[in-house]
A protein has these predicted regions:
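Conserved NTP phosphate-binding and transfer environment spanning the P-loop NTPase/kinase superfamily
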Residues: 93-175
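N-terminal pre-Walker A segment at the start of P-loop NTPase domains
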Residues: 1-9
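Domain-scale detector for complete catalytic domains at protein termini or as standalone homologs
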Residues: 3, 24, 173-175
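Short acidic/polar mixed-charge low-complexity motifs
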Residues: 19-21, 75, 124
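Glycine-rich phosphate-binding P-loop
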Residues: 19-44
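Pre-Walker A (Motif I) flank of P-loop NTPase domains
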Residues: 11-12, 17-20
Length: 175
């Protein structure tokens, strides 16, 4: 626990649009790499604008029934970029978590069970992507942020309202 009562966790977080992606996983699993990839994707327009919240260690607490993430004070504005070392970058002081990505997840499957696609943190249910060892998480995160689930109605054109490319409607993870 931190001084303000929030949980301190070994994770990274990036705010994309109005929501943060919380990236969890063991040491060396690629948390910082995915965080930086998301920052680059935001700059390129592939996803909504992205800003670092925290890398390596973040604080979690609840706010009005939502999960809030903040950077660890001593690491605020710092990100590890393999091959360059620790670098400074712009950061957000806090964000509401809209998506959790678990790297090196044991329950990663090609067609995951619905219960594998959510997680409960501090009593709050959050959408989740389990990513297995050896799989690239960036395409999965971009897909989660820019597509919707397939409907059983057969009206597949309504699933992606604006078609292809960068014009797909955002999902709850970024709203």
């Amino acid at each position: 626990m931190t001084e303000d009562g929030g949980a301190s966790v070994h994770a990274s977080a990036v705010r994309i649009g109005n929501r943060a992606v919380l990236i969890r996983g063991p040491s060396g699993s690629g948390k910082s790499h995915l965080a930086f990839d998301l920052l680059l994707s935001g700059r390129s327009g592939q996803i909504a604008p992205a800003i670092l919240v925290g890398d390596d260690r973040v604080h979690l607490d609840t706010d009005a029934g939502q999960l809030r993430v903040r950077p660890a004070a001593e690491l605020a504005g710092l990100i590890e970029i393999r091959g360059l070392g620790i670098r400074r970058c712009a950061f957000a002081g806090e964000a509401i978590v809209g998506l959790v990505v678990d790297l090196a997840a044991d329950d990663s499957e090609r067609l995951p069970a619905p219960e594998a696609l959510t997680t409960r943190i501090l009593g709050i249910l959050i959408p989740r992507i389990p990513v297995g060892v050896g799989y690239s998480p960036l395409p999965l995160v971009v897909a989660a942020l820019t597509t919707t689930e397939s409907s059983s109605s057969g009206n597949h054109s309504a699933d992606c309202l604006k078609g292809i490319g960068n014009h797909i409607s955002p999902t709850i993870a970024t709203e």
